[in-house]
Amino acid sequence: MRINMKKAEFLALLVLVIGVVCACGNTYAEEHTTEMSAETSGNIGNDSKIRESFAGESAADAQIDFDALREINSDIFAWIYIPDTAIDCPVLQSEQSDTFYEDHNAYGEEDDTGAVYIELANLTSMCDFNTVLHGKTGADEDGLFADLYRFANPEFFDDHEYVYLYLNGNVLTYEIFAAYERENTSLIRTYDFTYLSGCRQFLSDLYGTRGMAMNLRDEWENVNEYHYVITLTTQKEENAESQFVVVAVLIQDTAGTINRVVTE
């Protein structure tokens, strides 16, 4: 069961994907460009810090050229976009180390700013129960994921529901259902998301931590271990003991290819 299916059906009418779709298992179509209708795009809010786009790309103009991006860095497999924020950048996975993009930018150059990345335990096909995306806030709060903290504001949280993730040949739409601060421990190492029991435990713990400082969307309890979730995580340098996370559930898989085998 998916939450807000009427919204998902409406979004499907707005989303346009060019080319042959990709299949799960890290194999992708040869289509050069993935497009999304401009109606799903938004302008960066006044409170966000404007940063130079990576390689001139932006999902706000309704297209991502993955061929061009992979010529720059073959580790790029996706592009994340959250309307009304400065989060509009590539997502990478390094074959060298899970922490490579902690101190390297999306060009592969040494840079304390880092890049948005996933660990090797997650599939680049986005077929895991929970794909964890890491990004820095930065000392001056101008990092790639600094705007995640805006979701701590209940009004901003209520008004901004969606995360868009571009793959080569697909556009995935996620609805944000939780934003909160948690202990700074690795989700990938805390929960075994390859088993339903690990997925259930993650959701149970999320439910158990809800409180005044936690923003939750209505009907979030409908999210279960059979859904596909992304967790966006960041932290402030002066508060190394905790991390801020924004959790969203897949509500629209335009190409219809997201699937997985689940194990009890």
Each PLM stretch: what is its role?
Residues 2-11:
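Bacterial N-terminal signal peptides that target proteins for export
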Residues 11-17:
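Sec-dependent N-terminal signal peptides
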Residues 17-18, 228:
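Residue-level signal for mature regions of secreted extracellular proteins and peptides
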Residues 20-23:
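C-terminal motif of bacterial Sec signal peptides marking the signal peptidase cleavage site
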Residues 25-264:
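Solvent-exposed, non-transmembrane regions of membrane-associated and secreted proteins
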